[in-house]
Regions:
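C-terminal helical "tail/cap" subdomain of flavin- and related membrane-associated enzymes
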Residues: 354-474
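Predominantly flavin-linked oxidoreductase catalytic cores and closely associated redox partners
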Residues: 47-50, 157-294
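Short beta-strand to alpha-helix junction loop
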Residues: 80-83, 128-157, 205, 228-229, ...
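Extreme N-terminal leader/targeting segments of oxidoreductases
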Residues: 1-32, 47-60, 464-474
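Glycine-rich FAD pyrophosphate-binding loop
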Residues: 49-78
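FAD/FMN-dependent oxidoreductases across multiple families
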Residues: 8, 104, 143, 173, ...
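Glycine-rich Rossmann-fold phosphate-binding loop(s) that bind the pyrophosphate
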Residues: 37-38
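N-terminal FAD cofactor-binding segment of flavoenzymes
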Residues: 68-120
C-alpha cells in the first residue's frame, strides 16, 4: 500500500544520491509507453501513476494494445489457463485491486489428483475459497455472451481510471536514439518517449526485434504448451467435475503438468511440459484417467484451442537505458503463477522508474535483483519437477504419494504435509524453494517412506480407491 510520506521520502533519497543523471529520471510531463495491456502492462501503468501521485509527479502514460479483451475467442484471449493463487488474491486486495464477482468464474474449493493408481481430493487449506478461475479474454470462440468480464480487461480499465491513455495500435519496433526511445506502429505512426516498458509476453514478434536493440540481450527461453476449452454446461460440470480443479499425474514423457479447470459453462484444459506436440496430446487424451472425468467417458470436441509459448528462462538482461521488460517478456515463475510474477515485476519496475530513474544502471540496481530471485527459485523449481517426473515414471512411488495424501485428507489429526506440498505446487501459492525445503523435513520423509512401503503391500488396495475422499473431511 502506498503512502504519500513514503513516496516523498524515497524521492528525497533519490535527489540526494550522487551522482544524479537528471536526463534519465522522470519529471513532470515525462512520456512513458507501455507496450502490451495484459496483467503486467496494466499493473505497471496502475502502479506507476499511483506512485507518481504520492510525489506530485505528473506523467503521460500511453498503454499500447491492439486487442480488445471484451471480445470472445482469439481476438480477446491472452492464452492462459486462468488460475489466480490465494496469496496473489490477498496481495492484490491490499493494493486496492479487489477482484469483483463478474471477473471470477468460480472459487476452486479443492484439487483432485488423478493417477493410474487412484484418485484423491485435496481440500483447500483451512477450507477457504481463495483460488479463482478466470477468463483472460471474454470466453472461448463461438461461445454465447457471458455475464462476466475479462480479468485482463478489468486490470486494463483500472489503468485507464488511474490516468493511462489507451493506444489501440500494434507496436512493430522500438529504437533508442540515445536521448529518447521511439515506438513505431504497424499503421506507420511513431512517437518518442522517455521510457518504454515491454509487456507483450513471449508470443509477440516484438521480442525478436529487441535482440538488435540490446547488444547483450538474450530473449526468454520458451516452450510450447496447449490450452483448449470444452463446453459442458454448468449442470454437467457440477455433476462431473464439481468445484474442483482436476490435476493429472500420469506416466507420459515430457508432460510436466496437466489440469482441467471448471469455468462457468466451460472447462479449460492446460498441458505444460517440454514442447507439447500431437503425440503427447494423443497419449493424454487416450488415458482412462482423463476420459473418466468426462460424461460417459467420452471427451467432447473442444470449441477453442491454442499452442501458446511460455517463458521458462529469464531474459538477460531484461532492461536497458529507458527500456525495461516485465512479466513474461522478462521473467516469470516456472509453469505457475505467471500473473503473480507479472504483479511483482510490474510493481518493482514502476518503483524503480519513479523513485530512482530509468537508466540501465537504475534498473540493474533496483529491478534486476527481483528477476534474479525469481530465476534462482525457478532453478529449484526445475529440480522439483524433475523429482515429480521420477514419481510419474515409478508406479510404486505414485502409490505412496496417493496413500499419504488420502490418509491426510481423511484424518484431520495427521499433519497435511504431502497435501500442502501438492497444493502449493498446483496453485503456485509458495516459492519452489519453500516447497522443496518442506520435502526435506524429517517428518515428511518418514511419512513418505512408511506410505511407500504400506502402499505397495501385495493385495492391499490404495486408501483412496476404497472410499471417496470428501473435501470437508480434513
Amino acid at each position: 500500500v502506498l503512502h504519500a510520506s513514503d513516496g516523498l521520502s524515497q524521492l528525497g533519497q533519490r535527489a540526494q544520491a550522487q551522482p544524479v543523471d537528471l536526463a534519465k529520471t522522470l519529471h513532470d510531463g515525462s512520456r512513458i509507453a507501455v507496450v502490451g495491456a495484459g496483467p503486467s502492462g496494466s499493473m505497471f501503468s496502475y502502479f506507476l501513476l499511483k506512485m507518481a501521485d504520492t510525489v506530485a509527479l505528473e506523467l503521460d502514460v500511453h498503454l499500447y494494445e491492439p486487442r480488445h479483451f471484451c471480445h470472445r475467442g482469439p481476438a480477446g484471449c491472452n492464452h492462459c489457463g486462468g488460475i489466480v493463487s490465494e496469496s496473489l488474491v490477498q496481495r492484490l486486495a491490499t493494493e486496492g485491486i479487489a477482484l469483483p464477482d463478474d471477473v471470477v468464474q468460480r472459487g476452486i474449493e479443492s484439487y483432485t489428483l488423478h493417477m493410474d493408481v487412484g484418485d484423491v481430493e485435496i481440500a483447500t487449506p483451512l477450507h477457504e475459497r481463495r483460488i479463482a478461475a478466470i477468463y483472460r479474454g471474454n470466453g472461448p470462440r463461438n461461445s454465447e455472451p457471458l455475464d462476466t468480464h475479462s480479468f485482463d480487461g478489468y486490470l486494463q480499465q483500472l489503468a485507464y481510471d488511474q490516468g493511462a491513455t489507451a493506444m489501440p495500435k500494434l507496436v512493430t519496433n522500438v529504437t533508442n536514439d540515445g536521448e529518447q526511445m521511439r515506438v513505431e506502429c504497424a499503421d506507420g505512426s511513431s512517437a518518442d518517449y522517455d521510457l518504454v516498458v515491454i509487456a507483450t509476453g513471449v508470443n509477440s514478434r516484438l521480442i525478436k526485434t529487441l535482440q538488435g536493440q540490446l547488444s547483450e540481450y538474450s530473449p526468454p527461453e520458451v516452450t510450447k504448451t496447449f490450452i483448449c476449452e470444452f463446453h459442458l454446461g454448468k449442470e454437467l460440470i457440477r455433476k462431473t467435475l464439481g468445484p474442483s480443479m482436476h490435476v493429472f499425474l500420469l506416466d507420459i514423457p515430457r508432460l510436466e503438468f496437466a489440469a482441467l479447470i471448471p469455468k462457468g459453462n466451460y472447462v479449460t484444459l492446460c498441458l505444460l511440459g517440454d514442447d507439447i506436440d500431437d503425440k503427447l496430446m494423443e497419449q493424454f487424451f487416450s488415458s482412462p484417467e482423463v476420459k473418466n472425468c468426462f460424461p460417459g467417458g467420452v471427451i467432447p470436441p473442444h470449441v477453442c484451442h491454442c499452442y501458446p509459448r511460455i517463458n521458462i528462462q529469464t531474459a538477460k538482461p531484461s532492461y536497458g537505458d529507458r527500456l525495461v521488460m516485465i512479466g513474461d517478456s522478462g521473467t516469470t515463475r516456472l509453469f505457475k503463477d505467471g500473473i503473480g510474477a507479472s504483479y511483482r515485476t510490474a510493481k518493482a519496475a514502476a518503483r524503480t522508474a519513479v523513485f530512482h530513474g530509468v537508466a540501465a544502471e537504475d534498473f540493474r540496481k533496483y529491478y534486476w535483483p527481483l528477476c534474479k530471485k525469481v530465476d534462482s527459485d525457478n532453478q529449484i523449481g526445475k529440480l522439483v519437477f524433475a523429482i515429480g517426473s521420477l514419481v510419474q515414471r515409478a508406479r510404486f512411488a505414485r502409490r505412496g504419494v496417493l496413500r499419504m495424501t488420502a490418509n491426510e485428507q481423511k484424518n484431520p489429526e495427521i499433519p497435511p504435509r504431502m497435501s500442502e506440498v501438492l497444493w502449493d505446487l498446483f496453485s503456485g501459492s509458495a516459492p519452489y524453494r519453500e516447497v522443496f525445503l518442506r520435502t526435506l523435513h524429517p517428518a515428511y520423509i518418514a511419512s513418505l517412506m512408511w506410505n511407500l512401503v504400506a502402499g505397495n503391500v501385495p493385495g492391499k488396495k490404495p486408501a483412496a480407491k476404497q472410499e471417496p475422499v470428501e473435501s470437508g473431511n480434513g
